[in-house]
Swiss-Prot record:
It is found in: Cell membrane. The chain crosses the membrane at residues 13-33, 48-68, 80-100, 115-135, 155-175. This is Uncharacterized membrane protein YozB. Its main location: membrane. Pfam families: DUF420. Keywords: Cell membrane, Membrane, Transmembrane, Transmembrane helix. One of its GO terms (cellular component) is plasma membrane. The lineage of its organism: Bacteria, Bacillati, Bacillota, Bacilli, Bacillales. The gene is yozB. It is a multi-pass membrane protein. The keyword Transmembrane helix applies. It comes from Bacillus subtilis (strain 168).
Length: 178
């Protein structure tokens, strides 16, 4: 058997391309004109769906963490795939909503205003970072690069948990202003 058969495939190009496409699409959504042909549709349920998807992502990630601590790799993988699924559903709803609806401005005052913006800004920044981290972590786990997977997962898991939880918090804080 030659060495190229044992060497894991390099998915860096795919991960970086997906990262640029996903983060680029989300950035463009805030500057592009909204799609008028759907203005009659009741899309205000989509932010709540996003919060629900984020909630499930958070729960699935916690379950995956518990499963791996218990050395239940099979269940860990299933919960991670469930988290990726709810994250993908979130992304579809998020892009749909923000391609149609105008941005909602936060109307809170006092101490809640800086708290909201701190949570929002950290959520946005870490959301962009979590895209490649989650993809690389998934690839390393499923390609059985166990040590490399563990090394990156120590960063990915807490950041992804934070992003999914703060997504729900941001929704709860801004929902009165929809």
């Amino acid at each position: 058997m030659n060495q190229t058969e044992n060497k894991p495939k390099n998915y860096t190009g795919i991960v970086l391309t997906l990262t640029v496409l996903i983060n680029g699409l989300i950035a463009v959504l805030f500057f592009m004109p909204k799609l008028d042909q759907f203005s009659h549709a009741n899309i205000h349920i989509l932010p709540m769906l996003n919060a629900i998807f984020n909630s499930f992502t958070f729960i699935f990630l916690l379950a995956a963490l518990i499963m791996i601590k218990q050395k239940n790799i099979k269940a860990h993988k299933r919960f991670i795939l469930a988290a990726f699924t709810t994250t993908l559903l979130f992304l579809i709803c998020y892009v749909t909503y923000h391609s149609i609806a105008e941005n909602t401005l936060y109307g809170g005052e006092g101490i809640m205003r800086p708290i909201y913006f701190f949570i929002l800004i950290t959520h946005i920044c870490l959301s962009a970072i979590i895209v490649p981290l989650a993809l690389f972590t998934l690839i390393r786990g499923f390609s059985m690069q166990v040590e490399r997977h563990k090394k990156i997962a120590r960063w990915t898991m807490p950041l992804w948990l934070y992003v999914s939880l703060t997504g729900v918090i941001v929704y709860l804080m801004i929902s009165p202003y929809y």
